[in-house]
Amino acid sequence: MDSSRARQQLRRRFLLLPDAEAQLDREGDAGPETSTAVEKKEKPLPRLNIHSGFWILASIVVTYYVDFFKTLKENFHTSSWFLCGSALLLVSLSIAFYCIVYLEWYCGIGEYDVKYPALIPITTASFIAAGICFNIALWHVWSFFTPLLLFTQFMGVVMFITLLG
């Protein structure tokens, strides 16, 4: 492989700066330079797309047709699993809003997962544990439909949060 082709591949892979290329030239790899187009950053996908709109709409439909809030109101004080799931969901949503509102919007830290690597796993674990607790608490109401209904609700919440940040 000739040096100019190797340099192009290296530039594409690691996006070398021009001064790094000058150091490569000083090491004895002098050859004809070929011009390469600067890679453009890809546009991020829009936050509200068909996929997120579907989950939010499905969550609203499930909430309406299965009397979700009425069922939650009736089972609020009868099950400790429901209270535990509510606390875990509150922890998960609090961390998510802390990341989105405070770290990203207020402090301007776009890469908060790099600066605070423990936040994402803690949020994910508490969200999954909340889902398990809600499944146990509401199993007697909807039986084997409970995981499907709660998954639809959780996906609606997740897609709604992604609209914010």
From Swiss-Prot:
Tell me one Pfam family matched here. TMEM128
Chain ranges passing through the membrane: 49-69, 81-101, 119-139, 144-164
Keywords assigned: Membrane, Transmembrane, Transmembrane helix
Q: Which cysteines are joined by disulfide bonds?
A: none
Cellular component GO terms held in the UniProt record: membrane
What does the UniProt entry say about where the protein is found?
Answer: Membrane
Under InterPro entries, the record lists: TMEM128
- What membrane topology term does the record carry? Multi-pass membrane protein
Q: Does the keyword Transmembrane helix apply?
A: yes
Which residues are the signal sequence here?
Answer: none
Its name, as the record gives it, is Transmembrane protein 128
Organism from which the protein derives: Homo sapiens (Human)
